[in-house]
Amino acid sequence: MPTRHITLLARFGIASLSALLLAAPALAQSPDSAGTQPGDAEAKKTPDALTLDPTLPKWNPTEAKYVEVVSNLDGVPGLFRMWKDEKGVNLKAELPTSIDGQLLFLAYTIASGDPEAGVQFGDLYGSFKRFDRQLAFIQPNMVVRTTGDEESKLGRERVFTDRVQFKTPIEAAGPNGGWIVDLTNLFGRGANQFFGNRVAGADTSLLTIAKAKAFPRNVEVALKMPMRGGSFGSLHYSLSSVPEDNGYKPRLADQRVGYFTTTYRDIGQPSLEDPFVRYINRWRIEKADPNLTLSPAKEPIVFYIEHTTPIRYRRWVRDGILAWNRAFAQVGIDGAIQVYQQDARTGAHMEKDPEDARYNFILWTNSDMGYAIGPSRVHPKTGQILDADVVMDEGFVSSYARVWDLLPEVIGQAYTPETRAWLDSHPQWDPRLRLADPSVRGSLAARLHDELQHSIAAGTVPMGPMAAGVTPAGESATSEDASEAALMGPGAGEGLLGRGTQLNGYCRCGIAKTADLAIARMAAFALFDIEGAQKGDDKDNKDPDPDAPNRPGYIDGLPEEFVGALIKDVIMHEVGHTLGLRHNFKGSNLATLAEFNTAERPLVASTVMDYLPVNVNVGDGPAQGAWGMTDIGPYDLWVIQYGYSMDDDLKPILARVNDPGHAYGTDEDTFGPDPLARRFDMGKDPLDYADSQIRFVSGLRGQIIDRFVKPGDSWSRARRAWETLLSKQVQALNVAADWLGGAHVSRNAKGDPNEIAPVRAVDPVQQRRALQFLIDNALRDDAYGLTPELLSKLSVGRWMDEGGMRDIMAPPAWPVHDRVLAVQSMALTSILNPGTLERIADNEMMTPASQDALTIPETLDTLHAAVWTEVVAPPAGAFSDRSPMISSLRRNLQREWTDRTIELMFPGNFGGASAAAVSTLSRAQLERLLGELDGALASRPQADAYTLAHLSEIRNRVAKSLNPNFLYSR
């Protein structure tokens, strides 16, 4: 420690100096203000003399052979002192006695050894309190407050108490009179308190210190150990001070604009209809000169692009960050966001650590997962954003994604809670399982079941792999007993559920782009009129220098304007999250495909906060439009104006809710009835986009053999191309399925200009179009473009190693019947599920009897005619076993329909208020089919053996099911 600091400590006492440091705000928003923050001067108090607790043994680090951790190159003391032993295993900390009652943040992350390393796992807000020889971390109850009289305050304190999140022994008194605690024991051997089952089986006997850094307002600790299975992983903890009253004024949230919120229940105002108070999460951004129309920011938000970001991407990352300055300029702030490049070659900003809470970083990883996420740290009392980072995984650009594997993420996003519960008890009808690779169906089924159970326990709707929050001990969280202790990252309901303060816990925007990039690599010859820009999965043909383009104007084998634009698109999205913005899945409805596929290349959506597929013009407009979002859109400008305007009167801003481009629908809207509030669609009419995708798929299928696979390539490339294109077909089907029983939902309030009804049934013409789309592109044989020659080419790679093991275990011949039946099953489930049929029934009630409406009987009749075409009107001709009357794909479909309809006929197998109607109508469908089967068998006695056996078997099953003495057993 420098001499001047030793003198200072001897004169004034370490405890008071630590208190001064703890009282300072947590974030420096510009390079010049990293060491001094508003409020630092106010925090200076006359220090007390150094005193040692006589009840504690004294600990001498030198005698114990411990070395102090010194992190700051500028010599500024850290939040508290730390020492590590010579073996790099044990880490001790001296917490100053003044830390008792000081508000702190603790954020914890699986930093390595996990496919999604770096994504924040959880956080806690609270303070340490001493209980004799123990320190307990106590989390205040922030989700229930009172602004009422003294009696209501006393009542709150009696019922809604604070909670202990974890505790640790006080081992001794430190050199400066503070409390010595064992961080290795707390964060390493006690990691299950924070990570639950994710660290079950970790071998803490081989634990080592991976990182220990002490900064003025935060301390960073990472511990490395073998996880379950033996692979090393590291757990990262960040403990930082929290600023208190710094002049920030909270802003109330409004459901018409999409912000993450900080919410509490006010029990002191019983007259309020809604006792919940919601603040938006936002930064404190102010004008340096309030008198200027356009003023520089008083304290701008500063992002540092980490030096690990590849040079070829840096300008696109920078442009994506700075794009948001246009939104702040409209509220009078110039340069609200600044960007600096950290560079190892020049040394620029290399003294800044990405883990230091004083700095906001754009981090770059290479786990090949392809994700991107922009979490932030928010004050749980006010909603003020204190700091934020964006984690970008290079797999977004470089990985050759198995798009088929992403289907379970896409399919069923609109399933209602009733439908999810029904599929849980009827997994044989769940398209998420049917479409999954057979090798992962078991684990996926278990995950989906756990997801549902967590949502039931928490009283929430599942939105991700593990929707419900959990406490640090791994127990299920509820909104009041675990306000801030919610699992983030993979499976957190995107940081929305079980939390008083919401945040962007997980985001699939980057992964969605990964799938489209994989298609672009395979179809580069069609999209960019080039041949062999990249060999795809032939790694030996890639340029050995990752920073070198394959050719001028190209990066990573694709045109720079294409790859760079998508990187900028994703960065704009994630930075939007760090500014407090939630997803807006209605952004894609700004314009028609023809309107944005022009030479002028206008914006393809109203916001960067949507999940947009790559725009490919397939005869939809006169020219190829922008591949993705090239700038922030009208919704982004409007929502920033609401959140960051200097004006107190926000009503004029909200009055523009019905302006073009201001429609808003977020994550919880995706499982509602509105087909426009969906991920992965595009255009004002998503059914036009679905048609376009089918044209895209059909156009490329015929080129798989000749152009997708080059001389010398493995034929496994053909299989991957086929499954990738089939996945695009399934996604188009999924877009159409959401229109059945759909209703447009608006968030406008009564009296808003151009007010529209909050719920309006989708035009029945559009619903019938969607139903016919499902029939034409899933239930008919010609929807798949299969030929004997193509099937003979859909092989797998033959590498007996980790990279090829999955292909080795797959059948060499593509499982055509299993895959096609999975798609057919998906289409049937999209129609015959409780949520869809319930919505169709509700729309009937919402529509006057004199007006047209799609009904359940019409839906079932249309489906019946499509499935049983060969029976309703038997085709003429000579049939044989090699040329059957009913193809094998159609026979499978008809069995599937029969199984489902028999099951739906029996009470108890279908949920919702429409169950009785579905049961009686299903019986009517089977009775009708019985007569049609009799007619077909009588009129075509010389049909092929396959068809006759099939129809006879179906007839017998239907007849038995209609027998009142039939015992149904699933």
Regions found by a protein language model. Give the residues of each.
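N-terminal secretory signal peptides that target proteins for export/translocation
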Residues: 1-8
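Bacterial N-terminal signal peptides
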Residues: 11-24
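Auxiliary tRNA-acceptor-end handling modules of aminoacyl-tRNA synthetases
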Residues: 29-309, 318, 327, 331, ...
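Short pre-active-site segment immediately N-terminal to the catalytic Zn-binding motif
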Residues: 309-313, 553-571
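Extracytoplasmic/secreted envelope proteins and their assembly/folding machinery
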Residues: 318-321, 325, 564, 568, ...
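Sec-exported extracytoplasmic/periplasmic mature domains
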Residues: 322-333, 576-577, 581, 614, ...
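The catalytic-center signature of Zn2+-dependent metalloproteases
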Residues: 340-368, 565-572, 577-619
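Conserved catalytic/binding loops enriched for acidic/polar residues
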Residues: 480-562, 587-970
